[in-house]
Amino acid sequence: MDGDADAVKSGRHGSGQACQICGDGVGTTAEGDVFAACDVCGFPVCRPCYEYERKDGTQACPQCKTKYKRHKGSPAIRGEEGEDTDADDVSDYNYPASGSADQKQKIADRMRSWRMNAGGGGDVGRPKYDSGEIGLTKYDSGEIPRGYIPSVTNSQISGEIPGASPDHHMMSPTGNIGKRAPFPYVNHSPNPSREFSGSIGNVAWKERVDGWKLKQDKGAIPMTNGTSIAPSEGRGVGDIDASTDYNMEDALLNDETRQPLSRKVPLPSSRINPYRMVIVLRLVVLSIFLHYRITNPVRNAYPLWLLSVICEIWFALSWILDQFPKWFPINRETYLDRLALRYDREGEPSQLAAVDIFVSTVDPMKEPPLVTANTVLSILAVDYPVDKVSCYVSDDGAAMLTFDALAETSEFARKWVPFVKKYNIEPRAPEWYFSQKIDYLKDKVHPSFVKDRRAMKREYEEFKVRINGLVAKAQKVPEEGWIMQDGTPWPGNNTRDHPGMIQVFLGHSGGLDTEGNELPRLVYVSREKRPGFQHHKKAGAMNALVRVSAVLTNGQYMLNLDCDHYINNSKALREAMCFLMDPNLGRSVCYVQFPQRFDGIDRNDRYANRNTVFFDINLRGLDGIQGPVYVGTGCVFNRTALYGYEPPIKQKKKGSFLSSLCGGRKKASKSKKKSSDKKKSNKHVDSAVPVFNLEDIEEGVEGAGFDDEKSLLMSQMSLEKRFGQSAAFVASTLMEYGGVPQSATPESLLKEAIHVISCGYEDKTEWGTEIGWIYGSVTEDILTGFKMHARGWRSIYCMPKRPAFKGSAPINLSDRLNQVLRWALGSVEILFSRHCPIWYGYGGRLKFLERFAYINTTIYPLTSIPLLIYCVLPAICLLTGKFIIPEISNFASIWFISLFISIFATGILEMRWSGVGIDEWWRNEQFWVIGGISAHLFAVFQGLLKVLAGIDTNFTVTSKASDEDGDFAELYMFKWTTLLIPPTTILIINLVGVVAGISYAINSGYQSWGPLFGKLFFAFWVIVHLYPFLKGLMGRQNRTPTIVVVWAILLASIFSLLWVRIDPFTTRVTGPDTQTCGINC
């Protein structure tokens, strides 16, 4: 450490550093310090190269691509004259001012770190350490400085958890763990003896700099792109450049590793611009239409008119909240080859970040073990370094069936994983792979593939039989409870009162596959449950997995999957890493969300289960603002973001009016520039949005510290108050790049893991309020994502060509409505909570249109009330003979026609840029009405009962069972529920209204047919939207199509009423009145 300090000091006041562009000395500033062009990565660039790049180049650092800030003494360039810049504050992030000693030290450390990494391949900008360089710091001797908080960074994952054989079932506490000793902390000591090696960077860029320097010295000298001032004749790409002693091919490869790992792909202007124009036109037409409706009441039907106008105003507001977050849709591309070049070169240890994958399950009767097993198998076979993947299965029902099924799965994985990796098959869930109706021999050239596939299919069928046997055995619970293989009672016999359980099935020492290769870790977790403790359902289970994984493996990133969502694209994790590990983008990304795709849905998607309008339109629109909302599964998280920390704060630049709509913030005035960085950070965040910054902890370590052990203890207590009473877990939160300390033993880690899943661990901590999955709603996903966005994080929407994950969806009408009811109930709970996006987090860093989207996500169930009224109005109008619209003139009819045209045009152009089919769009419109007048309506009243009266509703797990009685047998199964009553009632009264309206028109003559057409159109609009519901209500019709039955009943009713009206058997004779004329008339 002392040697490092001396090296830094000598480097700060020396000028021996070479510019990595031209080879000249970097030089010093006016104060005598080493000139640092980029304060983010410390890439050595001399002053002339820096000035050229700002004036004529890309204005960004060649290594990290961060835009250069103007240094003291540098002339302003075009675009900077009107900006509120500070030449002294050259950082793009809130570091201390450049003149301070802390900043100088940070710059020197960054430049020294770059020296150690230059020329070493991937992981640019991150310090690398030899395995023997990890040791305790000098503070171990007892010298504890003031403000010192022990922290660990960049630790390698070690202290592997041994896998257990099937006879070692679990580890559960046999008694009180007792007083836990302080967890050993380690720190890194970089090796200062590593040789400095430069990098040529971009060759063409270097040549432009050389020409610019000559032009500055000798006047204007013409240059041509790609031509050096002093070219070497006959030199090819593979020749040696004498000025740098570097091979050109290596230089080009090195330049490739510096390229971004992903990029935004804006939509073509020919598609997005007409779409935006139609939105604006529709807004104008809608305003004129509402003005006309308000100023032209219907005198003889005033109540009906008033109700309709209120509903139409609400629909307009709802449309605005839904439409404008789709103003900036984008696509994204990833470069997996660049990711491999930078972090996963062949023949070298992989530098990819570790990922902990969470699978959650509750009830094995509703979530079949075979479905969960397929999900786990697809995870274990993912295309990612095995030592970087850990799979944690949360069994919140403490079912022995789930435990035994995982034991069987771990054994079958030893055969399945090498098979799929050998032949590179997709998908890697065996159930779905073997059920594919495709040519499985396509692109397969290995002579033994057919034989191996046949043998593997037989192995899988035997595996299915064993799982089915476990399920059959579990149907009848013994009176004395379940007994394990060793004769001891199963600890989870009482699902509401049992200890925490952890079992490691696979891992470093948990056995190898059939080819002798290591398998990813597979860990079974069942958190402790006791009566009288609030367990917070799925959110509580996910937070328990976060803590267990942090103690055992501490992957830098986490993937959350439902038990029925398997990995369909084995490169899904690499796709996510293209964003999360990108040096420019990754540091501000809280999660990468993938779209949900589904198997087993009927061809017509009767109940809009695919939900492509939401996943392919709405979320792509949000990706252009601050990122998509978290949808509960298929999401890769940055662990730091889940811990409640804030992202690095970027100083906002002045932008256009449209960028301000997206949330751009004005810069602080010059008079406030001299305030501290902490005050600047706090300006962005409301008091209701607590923010914890890792930089604050680092400053506490570096600054004036504590004088005694009592002050150090107070600092540790503040962290334990936030994260809980676990020294091991608190230490893991300070490891920026994940990993567990090498000195930790598997036994101590397992004991600590049992402790962090105890039912009382979260008491008096910030779990569920500021850290982890947020409590307070059954849709914890929306709330969790909203909290992270409010802190300033952004999310990414990744849509690879091959869907990353696939799952199952309820195709039965009743199950689908119950699923929608749960989602809507969660939104209502958020709406009436303190986290309501209408008022929560103002003054923070949530962008304006992103807030629009969250408001729409929570307020949409309320639309069910005006929608229900609007669906009843047609029948009332037909039965009473009145209408909600007065007689309109030809001029007024133009606005009605224009409104309908703009509605259809918006939909058509939306489908055009998104690729969503018209059938999918129409199914979404239909189910919006079906769900609105049933599930959403019930959710509003249940939410009000919960908030006002404290009456809680039970959370029901959506069944994931597959069809066993034929294809889509569940689609036609009739399951009665109270959710079916409102749509059924509306259907009947509208059909009766149609019959009554036609009869009335016949009775009144041809003069009544004109007003009738408007009423009939109104009624048929409701009936057509409810047609899928009507089909589901009638079930399977083996002989007569449903549409025939409906029209038969409708036409029979009309003709019956006509028959009664005409009464053809009654003789009607026209003549004089017999009473007047008498008998002789």
Curated annotation (Swiss-Prot):
Which EC number(s) does the record attach to this protein? 2.4.1.12
Q: Which residues form the active site?
A: D396, D781
What is the UniProt remark on how the cofactor binds and its stoichiometry? Binds 2 Zn(2+) ions per subunit.
Kindly list the cofactors needed: Mn(2+); Zn(2+)
Q: Which residues lie on this side of the membrane: Extracellular?
A: 299-300, 886-890, 948-977, 1031-1039
| Basic and acidic residues composition bias: residue spans | 103-112
The positions annotated for binding UDP-alpha-D-glucose are S360, K366, E367, D396, K537
Which residues are sugar-modified?
N954
Q: Where is this region: Disordered?
A: 72-148, 660-684
Subcellular location(s): the record lists:
Cell membrane
Is Glycoprotein among the key words of this record?
yes
The UniProt entry lists the main location of this chain as: membrane
> Which Cys residues form disulphide pairs?
none
The topology of this chain with respect to the membrane is:
Multi-pass membrane protein
For this record, the Gene Ontology CC terms, alphabetical, are: plasma membrane
The pathway entry for this protein reads as:
Glycan metabolism; plant cellulose biosynthesis
Locate the residues binding Mn(2+). K538, D562
Q: Does the keyword Thylakoid apply?
A: no
Substrates-to-products reaction catalysed:
[(1->4)-beta-D-glucosyl](n) + UDP-alpha-D-glucose = [(1->4)-beta-D-glucosyl](n+1) + UDP + H(+)
Q: Which residues bind Zn(2+) 1?
A: C19, C22, C46, C49
Start and end residues of each RING-type zinc finger? Answer: 19-65
Cytoplasmic compartment: which residues? 1-277, 322-864, 912-926, 999-1009, 1061-1081
- Coiled coil region boundaries: 450-477
Which family, according to the similarity comment?
Answer: Belongs to the glycosyltransferase 2 family. Plant cellulose synthase subfamily.
Q: What is this protein called?
A: Probable cellulose synthase A catalytic subunit 8 [UDP-forming]
Organism of origin is Oryza sativa subsp. japonica
Q: What is the lineage of its organism?
A: Eukaryota, Viridiplantae, Streptophyta, Embryophyta, Tracheophyta
